[in-house]
Amino acid sequence: MNHVQPMIHEDGLPGDESRLEPRPEWRPKYPGSGRLEGKVAIITGADSGIGRAVAALYAREGADIVIVYLLEDEDAEETRRIVEAEGRKAIVVKADVGSKKMCDRIARQTIETFGRIDILVNNAGEQHPDEDITDISEEQLLRTFQTNIFGMFYLTQAVRPHLKSGAAIINCTSVTMYKGSKDLLDYSSTKAPSRPSQDHCRKISSAKASASTP
């Protein structure tokens, strides 16, 4: 498989996808079959990358989408246009999932707009490549855990009272959880908790819970 090296790359966090050249490929390449017709999905980190691709695919399958993002307004609005082009409704919610208060607001806005929550995709994540463990600052360590672990818990707590039988919680994890990474020690350390948390969700609620490794 040939890989195209981008002419322009984005080192900032979160990345501004609108600046990339060539742009990442996200378009669904199959006709939808209505498998998510009438469902409402909250997708964190949906302004770009995996989150945008999931939003596009879910919309094609019939779901309305709550696009949760941190900073990149232009990217989030483009994801909204993508969803609406599929004939579905979308709202954008600018929020830091590392804040419990903001996670509560995400759930509240979803219920106020759509009246239901059927799917939660905990996709938002933060990673900072470092050559050595001594390069990881206290601020970076706290921020990575706040986003990747606390955010998953906070938002799952916020949507839990609104989930009915057949609902789904999807936690996006990483191959680094299994293999480790010499450059992403703090990031890979935050991915392991997604497995026990999903097992707990399955046992105490009516929602399906799964971990996805992109």
Q: What is the predicted function of each stretch?
A:
Residues 56, 108, 112, 147-167, ...:
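Amphipathic alpha-helical dimer-interface segment in Rossmann-like NAD(P)H-dependent oxidoreductases
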Residues 156, 190, 198:
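Active-site helix of classical SDR
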Residues 134-153, 170, 194-195:
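Catalytic Tyr-X3-Lys loop
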Residues 4-5, 31, 99-104, 112, ...:
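Conserved mid-core segment of classical short-chain dehydrogenase/reductases
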Residues 59, 146, 151, 180, ...:
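The catalytic Tyr-X3-Lys active-site helix of short-chain dehydrogenase/reductase
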Residues 58, 116-118, 195, 205-214:
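Conserved Rossmann-fold SDR core element
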Residues 34-66:
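Canonical Rossmann dinucleotide-binding motif of NAD(H)/NADP(H)-dependent dehydrogenases/reductases
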Residues 63-78:
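Conserved glycine-rich Rossmann-like NAD(P)H-binding loop of the short-chain dehydrogenase/reductase
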